[in-house]
């Protein structure tokens, strides 16, 4: 990790598109501070890189790292429809094709279905050096959706009626019946350091998913349960200080520090 001076306080932001092997356009933003390490942020379902919570995460991590954000297909400014993790691995691979040659160290933080996609990619792709996996489903067919446990004010009104909560939201859904890999079958193939973070109040994907994935992870690993924490990106809304501190500490410990 490179120590940044005051002149790097305002990053250079590059926006563009990447093309996947199956010809989809993937929209990205690259925040460049001159760091030797980059953190890739992979959003969850119904979110995008424009989500204010992820923009806040970018600001929090951008003081120490360059940041690369992108939209999965069917979300934000990317093309196509969302295939419920079946083909979105091509989107992350296109990101790694572009970003991996530019940095000596690459971290990835992924949320919910984005984390599920990431596990399936990282099982065979070794171009990421450290991984933070937030609220990941261990098996797409076993997502919980405990509707009776949701907080109507925070979980529904925030998205539908809050002006900030609506920014960056939306999805263009595609076929859900396509074959899907199971993260629980792939997590054991990942050899890089992995930290799992899950909110204890997550009603969409219950904490047992992260616990099951953690048990099958063979390398350096850690699991964090945030008491009363909600699902995925909303941990940044309700517990930003704790969430950011855990992420920063993990990447500090698992990405090689380069002082230059």
What are these regions (language model features)?
Residues 1-33:
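N-terminal cap/lid segment of alpha/beta-hydrolase-fold proteins
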Residues 45-58:
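The serine-hydrolase catalytic nucleophile loop
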Residues 73-102:
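Catalytic nucleophile-loop/oxyanion-hole region of alpha/beta-hydrolase
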Residues 123-176:
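Hydrolase active-site cap/lid region
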Residues 190-191, 196-198, 202:
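Short beta-strand/loop motif that positions the catalytic acidic residue
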Residues 201-205, 233:
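Acidic catalytic loop of the alpha/beta-hydrolase fold
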């Amino acid at each position: 990790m490179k120590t940044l001076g005051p002149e790097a306080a305002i990053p250079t932001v590059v926006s563009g598109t990447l093309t996947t092997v199956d010809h989809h356009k993937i929209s990205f933003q690259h925040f460049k501070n001159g760091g030797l390490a980059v953190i890739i942020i992979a959003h969850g379902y119904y979110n995008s890189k424009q989500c204010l919570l992820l923009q806040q995460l970018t600001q929090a991590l951008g003081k120490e790292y360059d940041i690369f954000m992108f939209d999965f297909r069917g979300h934000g400014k990317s093309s196509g429809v969302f295939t419920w993790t079946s083909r979105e691995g091509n989107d992350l691979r296109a990101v790694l094709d572009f970003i991996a040659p530019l940095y000596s160290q690459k971290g990835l933080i992924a949320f919910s279905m984005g984390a599920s996609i990431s596990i399936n990619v990282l099982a065979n792709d070794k171009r990421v050096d450290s991984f933070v996996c937030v609220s990941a489903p261990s098996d797409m067919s076993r997502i919980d959706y405990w509707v009776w446990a949701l907080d109507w004010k925070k979980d529904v009104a925030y998205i539908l009626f809050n002006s900030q909560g609506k920014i960056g939201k939306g999805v263009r859904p595609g076929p859900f019946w396509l074959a899907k890999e199971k993260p629980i079958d792939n997590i054991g193939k990942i050899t890089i350091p992995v930290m799992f973070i899950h909110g204890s109040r997550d009603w969409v994907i219950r904490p047992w998913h992260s616990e099951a994935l953690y048990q099958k992870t063979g390398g350096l690993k850690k699991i964090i349960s945030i008491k009363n924490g909600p699902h995925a990106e909303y941990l940044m809304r309700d517990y930003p200080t704790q969430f950011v501190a855990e992420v920063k500490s993990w990447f500090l410990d698992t990405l090689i520090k380069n002082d230059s």
